[in-house]
A protein has these predicted regions:
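Extracellular "spike/adhesin" assembly and maturation modules
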Residues: 1-142
């Protein structure tokens, strides 16, 4: 699976009548976040000790519902990834409950911003590693 640039410009507002206008979270957004976390895990295990993320199954299709436990698992997978690698501070993730509050644009910006930051940092760490060519006397050395 390939890296997809996270959406970090989520926006929204609610008018005085309680009507929301702004970005909507859909199947492609869920898949992007889920798959980017898996991509980061695959990148991280080349630099850090082996660890695993909880699988969220197949990609979602339009019309699929997202449940509180799945959204919580995205947050937990981010926390697992962060804890096993760079240990950055990305704020505290809320816990979602069935028929309770849902992710808003602020939480989506925090989540996808953290994913992008980890990607940038892990990429820099991977590309910045020193590598040596060892010849062991092949060209008239000692």
């Amino acid at each position: 699976m390939a890296w997809q640039t996270p959406k970090t410009d989520w926006h929204g507002s609610t008018n005085s009548e309680g009507v929301y206008t702004g970005d909507r979270f859909n199947a492609s957004d869920f898949n992007r976040i889920k798959n980017n976390l898996t991509f980061l895990r695959d990148m991280a295990i080349n630099l850090y000790k082996e660890f695993s993320l909880v699988s969220l199954g197949d990609d979602r299709v339009p019309g699929d519902y997202f449940y509180a436990d799945e959204i919580n698992q995205l947050e937990e997978n981010l926390e697992t990834l962060n804890t096993n690698t760079l240990r950055m501070s990305y704020g505290s993730a809320p816990v979602y409950n069935d028929n309770g509050t849902t992710m808003d644009f602020k939480e989506l910006n925090r989540l996808e911003g953290a994913i992008l930051d980890l990607y940038d940092r892990l990429t820099n760490e991977s590309e910045g590693r020193r590598t040596f060519t060892w010849n062991f006397g092949m060209k008239g050395g000692l």
